Amino acid sequence: MINVEAQSLTPGEHGIHIHETGRCDLPDFETAGSHFNPYGTEHGLENPSGPHAGDMPNLLVGENGEVVNYQTEISTPLSGGEESLMGHTGGTAIVIHADRDDQMSNPSGNSGARIACGVISPG
């Protein structure tokens, strides 16, 4: 289960994904790498050839700039090898994008710039 709490975001829907590298360097969080995709699938929860292991439903941000009760289940294990979130040095990252994810287009669903990032790492 992933729970997201965030504030000071633009109201509306935003793409949110787990990325392959546990780094979130400013200014654009590109150090987080691509979507976490150990199985080599296509992007998008609605894509018949997908999704990436790091694809998640869009995040909804309320008029006050805060995330509206975001919880989602992912099938990717936390530990246990290269196909897990902690399977390689440095962990992974969770990235929020400026626009909504269309859940189909490669490589990132036309979800726009990376606007927030957090590292997922072992305690």
Go through each PLM region and give its residues.
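N-terminal leader/targeting pre-sequences
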Residues: 1-13, 18-123
